[in-house]
Amino acid sequence: MALWVKLLITVVVSYLVGNINFALVLSRIKHGDIRHSGSGNPGTMNVVRTYGKVVGVVCLLLDAFKAAVPAFFFWWLCAGNPYDISDKLGLYVSGLSVVVGHIFPVFLKFKGGKGIACIIGISLLAHPFVTLIAFAVGLIFLIVVKIGALASFIMIFSPNIYEAISLGGTQPAVSALIFAMMTLAVLAHHANLVRLFSGTENLTVLFRFGKKKGQK
């Protein structure tokens, strides 16, 4: 099969998989609609705020898994040598397509989540150790500072910058796909950044330490 045919299949299938919004699915299971709760965003952070940490973790894992499964398959399919894991074109074509499908889902009138969990799933395939460290640092930042958008950027930018540097210009198409994926994630957080700079950003409180004054 010609490479362009493989890539076309990769884009279409991955985009459609990206349309599956687990935040919305989980909220339906809870007899609600995440789009009408909290910030209105059908994504992990809003699930945490609305339904709690356990459901939020489930949402994160499902969205990461949703991106990782097709990316792994198409990474293998599109490689010149199926056992050459350094050829990452299929991985990132699939990854970007899933993210586009997640942010702009045709079945939800192009109003989806922000793609962070999906990008984490892709990054775990490419550089699991670096991604886990970045996730841990971002999680600590979230617990302390409580700003979800910035914590998310820590989680996704660190492993992808590492990937771009490690490629060293050997796969310019892959570097371009990584740049496009990061740009989409930032643009998806436009409203968060506006609120952040105006001092009105929603806080995500994972843990409450101590008790308020007057509480027994």
Where are these regions (language model features)?
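Cytosolic, membrane-interface loops and tails of multi-pass inner-membrane proteins
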Residues: 24-55, 194-216
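Loop-to-transmembrane alpha-helix initiation sites
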Residues: 132, 148-155, 170-181
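C-terminal ends of transmembrane helices
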Residues: 23-26, 101-111, 138-145, 190-194
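N-terminal signal-anchor transmembrane alpha helix
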Residues: 5-29
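Interfacial segments of multi-pass membrane proteins
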Residues: 48-52, 74-78, 115-145, 157-166
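Nucleotide and nucleotide-moiety/phosphate-recognizing core
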Residues: 6, 55-61, 65-106, 126-130, ...
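Alpha-helical transmembrane segments of multi-pass membrane proteins
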Residues: 14-17, 97-102, 138-142, 159, ...
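Short, non-helical or kinked segments that cap or interrupt transmembrane helices
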Residues: 33-44, 107-120, 147-155
